[in-house]
């Protein structure tokens, strides 16, 4: 996948993440200055899971996010298109399923809630992905999307863009087995919709009542919505 090619071929994306699975969690912690742990906890809290609920964690990668969700007592399923990523998390005691975000291997109305963290950008057609997540969610069920977003403080936003363009690729080359994956990450973040634009897309593709919460000055935003009852 070329540096500036954000028209994502699913198999290119899967192969890219297969290559980084072994060191993925450590690399993310380094690149986020340890904020990834905070963001996972806040995602769990935002989803407001109850013991016994059935939850889909899409684009779960090594399932570190799924383990965090499972602290709620819910039954959590990790689903990812990258077999290499799921294999890297083989020792994490949660259910794991290989699946494409545009054609999920689950029946209609299977889950009480669904979440996707930093993976919606990587679905070939993210609008189709939103509709597919709605399909497998029960009426009245919840969605939380954790995704990199637009910083809300202008000066901080300028610093953040400089980090994405200059420092992140350099750090990735030092700590990642596939730095091109993180160059793609930086490019895709810059091309991603703002908080308000993404909320509008979510409301137009299978969900309703979407709102969001900014984390770390808007570097990350948690978008939450409900699947309509009818």
From Swiss-Prot:
Protein's name according to its UniProt entry: Demethylmenaquinone methyltransferase
Swiss-Prot/TrEMBL keywords: Menaquinone biosynthesis, Methyltransferase, S-adenosyl-L-methionine, Transferase
UniProt pathway annotation: Quinol/quinone metabolism; menaquinone biosynthesis; menaquinol from 1,4-dihydroxy-2-naphthoate: step 2/2
Positions bound to S-adenosyl-L-methionine: 62, 80, 100-101, 117
SUPFAM superfamilies recorded: S-adenosyl-L-methionine-dependent methyltransferases
InterPro entries attached to this UniProt entry: SAM-dependent_MTases_sf, UbiE/COQ5_MeTrFase, UbiE/COQ5_MeTrFase_CS
Reaction it catalyzes: a 2-demethylmenaquinol + S-adenosyl-L-methionine = a menaquinol + S-adenosyl-L-homocysteine + H(+)
Family in the record: Belongs to the class I-like SAM-binding methyltransferase superfamily. MenG/UbiE family.
Enzyme class: transferase
Keyword Cell inner membrane appears in the UniProt entry: no
EC number: 2.1.1.163
Transmembrane segment boundaries: none
BP GO annotations: menaquinone biosynthetic process; methylation
GO molecular function, one term: demethylmenaquinone methyltransferase activity
């Amino acid at each position: 996948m070329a540096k500036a090619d954000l028209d994502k071929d699913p198999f290119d994306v899967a192969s890219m993440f297969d290559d980084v699975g072994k060191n993925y969690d450590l690399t993310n912690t380094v690149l986020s200055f340890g904020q990834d742990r905070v963001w996972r906890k806040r995602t769990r809290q935002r989803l407001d899971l109850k013991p016994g609920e059935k939850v889909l964690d899409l684009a779960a990668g090594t399932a570190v996010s799924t383990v965090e969700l499972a602290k709620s007592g819910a039954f959590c399923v990790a689903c990812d298109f990258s077999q290499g990523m799921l294999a890297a998390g083989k020792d994490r005691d949660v259910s794991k399923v290989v699946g494409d975000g545009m054609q999920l291997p689950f029946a209609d109305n299977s889950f009480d809630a669904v979440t996707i963290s930093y993976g919606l950008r990587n679905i070939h057609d993210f609008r189709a992905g939103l509709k597919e997540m709605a399909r497998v969610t029960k009426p009245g069920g919840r969605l939380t999307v954790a995704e990199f977003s637009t910083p809300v403080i202008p000066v901080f936003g300028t610093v953040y863009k400089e980090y994405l363009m200059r420092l992140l690729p350099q750090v990735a080359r030092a700590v990642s087995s596939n730095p091109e994956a993180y160059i793609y990450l930086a490019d895709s973040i810059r091309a991603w919709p703002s908080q308000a634009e993404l909320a509008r897309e979510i409301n137009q593709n299978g969900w309703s009542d979407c709102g969001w919460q900014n984390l770390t000055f808007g570097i990350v935003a948690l978008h939450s919505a409900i699947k309509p009852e009818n």
